[in-house]
Amino acid sequence: MSTNEYVLNMRQVSVDSKTHKNILSIENFTVRPGELVAVLGPNGAGKSTLLRTINLLQPYRGEMQLFGKDVRNTNKTLLRRRSALVFQETLLLDDTVFNNVAKVLKFRGTPTHKIKQRVYTALTAFSCEHLANQSARSLSGGEAKRVCIACGLVADSELLLLDEPSASLDVGIRPQMIEKIRQLAQERGSAVILVSHNFTDILHFADRAIALFDGCIIQDDNLETIIRRPVNEQLARLVGIDNIIPWWVERSSRASFIKLANGIKFLYPGEITKPITACCLSGDTFNVYDASSSILHKPWSVIIEGLVERVLNGIGICSIWVKVGEQTLIARVPRNNIFGNVYPHEIIKLAFNAQDAHFV
């Protein structure tokens, strides 16, 4: 794909703080038209700095193209008008809700006769059309956030940058708001870069994710791979891998055996070529073992025994804390995969596929 077919193309982009400390270092990051990308990372990783840099609000070094145009040789105001940034903070003018949203269109030269309809369409999409004549100062935190999102989407931007869009929203309406943003972006063909600490937002929204640590992209992949196969232990903890266990390998002339710190030992079917420190086992890789379970018919299956410490019955999922050796494993098992009931203080067996083990 040629560079003018990307809405964003960053090469060797660096940003320094006021104290000359490097806070962002992007070797290569591209976004295609219509692509939905999530940005993961701990606090202070540079996520908001990345969005401000893309929106040309942050001085930087390196090469960046927006909409196929070299930023250094193009009017930055014109480029910025083709994108929209919704800040984490609720930044609204001391004016009515209607005028806050309308000013976005006026700044972009939208014909006056089209403004009213577009403003109400944007407000309605995020359930705040009834707030149109209210002062922005009178809004609750959640209402102000929805108005900010409406401001971001009213202009049909080619690139939408969202910094924690679900912050301040009630838990009950977050999925609805995120789904609406996704729907509108897909209808318009807009590319979106979404920063969020809420993994539910990310799972419902993005097809691709980048993991940002200390200002650097450490993994760029589809969501399933990042969640199941994180590149290091830091990211494994961030995405919520249930079980991260120290391990070592025992090799023979014919095979490699993995021995975990809790005493579990199993034959591993693949090759281990890089230095690694921990074995990651997601809770949903486990099955509660039963003699009739189909896990017996899977290759490389591992069966372990432990003492149930705690059981949490959720909607459709049962979370079970099982003490194995000196460590506790967490298994998340579909309720219909459990034969009978599981209670604390009883001995149960768990089974998993060795190929589901991931090493970092």
Language-model segments: residues:
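The feature captures the beta-strand-to-loop junction immediately N-terminal to the Walker
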Residues: 40-42
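Conserved ABC ATPase "signature" region
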Residues: 113-131
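Conserved ABC ATPase signature
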Residues: 135-139, 143
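Catalytic Walker B motif of ABC-type/P-loop ATPase nucleotide-binding domains
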Residues: 160-164
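Glycine/charge-rich catalytic "coupling/switch" loops of P-loop NTPases
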Residues: 262-310, 337-360
